[in-house]
């Protein structure tokens, strides 16, 4: 969470004082947010859910994904991207990333099989995927595209908001995201049928609220409704979002400019697919070796992408162990409909991805940073680069005081 204050407190207090915490009622905060956020994204429909994970699941349900289908997911994303696929009875197929830390379009194209139905491009750490290439491949091969925007809220790609480019987009409003209500999520689309199915997945009583005759064919959903408390806080957070993103973009621009000379040492900024539309939540650098990345991250507060726990496929126990459901009879890996799908994961899976991840370091931006904070960050990056890439001694460099890495946010592991 970057910013929250009296406005959020007052908005939540107003809902509590009203006694109307259920989202279906007059002057609904949730309805207001859904309409406002849909306009912000440039889509026709937005539906709130209890979490980003359920937003992903609702998006898959909305698109008609289920048993018998494969869904392509990147090797670097929070495990919920893959487990959401399992939750609808489909099988996740893991695809390599490129140096942007997003799904590699060439690897995506090569991974398409006869029963591949969809792809989930993940705008990881707020960095946009190469959506032009992905949408071109999807159109030619008949794939559905569900953007995972859980970490990319506020970002865009070539002038379009993330999540508005594919057939649907899933969002998270978890505490660690660019816009937050503590927990929460949602699904965006301009397809009314996808929106209706997603809303029915989120709320098993959705059919009743609008009248049975006006709804689609009913199916059993799971209650993942938002509350008015979520809607109230998000309406305030939405007012803050553009300012948060603008501040981080300005900071990142200064940091990249101030460290450009370090490319001569081997500290290379990670490539971006649409840098002007970047969320700018992180500055990412690619180093020449794992050892250099480790030395860099030990010198100043920073995170190695390959050490972010369940953001890497090697930590997805439910997937790798084929434990895809709470009951054996529902396990997608043993469903007869999934016979013939790619159910196993090779021992050498993702070697290229792991090499990139273990050589990429990330430094978090923060809209609260002032000029002095940014100057200190640039100074520290210079110092860490000298230690990691020129074998300078820690005694030979000055490391200025900096905030520690939020290990909980990054699920960081040693």
List each model region and its residues:
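Conserved PLP-binding active-site segment of the aspartate aminotransferase-like
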Residues: 271-274, 278-291, 308-329, 358-372
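Conserved PLP cofactor-binding pocket of PLP-dependent enzymes
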Residues: 206-212, 254, 258, 297-361, ...
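N-terminal "arm"/small-domain region of PLP-dependent enzymes with the aminotransferase-like
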Residues: 1-22, 143, 362-364
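Active-site region of PLP-dependent enzymes
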Residues: 152-158, 165-282
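PLP-dependent aminotransferase-like
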Residues: 61, 65-149, 156, 413
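Generic structural signal for small/hydrophobic residues in well-ordered secondary structure
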Residues: 12, 37, 55, 71, ...
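Phosphate-binding glycine-rich loop
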Residues: 22-70, 84-86, 94, 160
């Amino acid at each position: 969470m970057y910013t929250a204050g009296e406005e959020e407190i007052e908005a939540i207090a107003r809902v509590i004082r009203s006694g109307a915490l259920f989202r279906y009622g007059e002057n609904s905060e949730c309805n207001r947010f859904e309409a406002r956020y849909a306009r912000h994204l440039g889509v026709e429909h937005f539906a709130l859910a209890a979490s980003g994970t359920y937003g992903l699941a609702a998006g898959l349900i909305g698109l008609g994904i289920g048993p018998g289908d494969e869904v392509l997911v990147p090797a670097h994303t929070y495990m919920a991207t893959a487990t959401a696929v399992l939750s609808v009875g489909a099988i996740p197929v893991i695809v390599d990333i490129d140096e942007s830390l997003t799904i590699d379009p060439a690897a995506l194209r090569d991974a398409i099989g006869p029963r591949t139905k969809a792809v989930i491009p993940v705008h990881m750490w707020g960095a946009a995927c190469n959506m032009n290439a992905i949408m071109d491949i999807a159109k030619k091969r008949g794939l559905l595209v569900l953007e995972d925007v859980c970490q990319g809220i506020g970002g865009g790609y070539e002038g379009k908001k993330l999540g508005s480019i594919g057939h649907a987009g899933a969002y998270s409003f978890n505490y660690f995201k660019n816009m937050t209500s503590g927990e929460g999520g949602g699904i965006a689309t301009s397809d009314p049928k996808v929106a209706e199915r997603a809303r029915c997945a989120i709320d098993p009583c959705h059919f009743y609220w609008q009248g049975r005759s006006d709804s689609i064919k009913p199916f059993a959903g799971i209650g993942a409704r938002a509350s008015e408390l979520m809607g109230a806080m998000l309406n305030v957070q939405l007012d803050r979002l553009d300012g948060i993103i603008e501040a981080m973009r300005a900071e990142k621009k200064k940091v990249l400019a101030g460290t450009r000379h370090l490319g001569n040492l081997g500290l290379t900024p990670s490539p971006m697919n649409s840098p002007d539309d970047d969320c700018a939540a992180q500055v990412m650098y690619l180093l020449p070796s794992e050892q250099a990345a480790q030395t860099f991250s030990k010198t100043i507060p920073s995170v190695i992408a390959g050490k972010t726990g369940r953001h890497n496929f090697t930590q997805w126990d439910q997937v790798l162990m084929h434990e895809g459901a709470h009951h054996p009879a529902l396990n997608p890996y043993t469903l007869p409909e999934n016979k013939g799908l790619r159910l196993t994961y090779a021992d050498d899976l993702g070697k290229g991805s792991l090499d990139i991840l273990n050589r990429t370091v990330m430094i978090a931006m923060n809209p609260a940073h002032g000029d002095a904070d940014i100057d200190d960050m640039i100074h520290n990056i210079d110092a860490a680069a000298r230690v990691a890439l020129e074998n300078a001694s820690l005694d030979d460099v000055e490391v200025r005081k900096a905030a520690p890495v939020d290990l909980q946010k990054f699920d960081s592991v040693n």
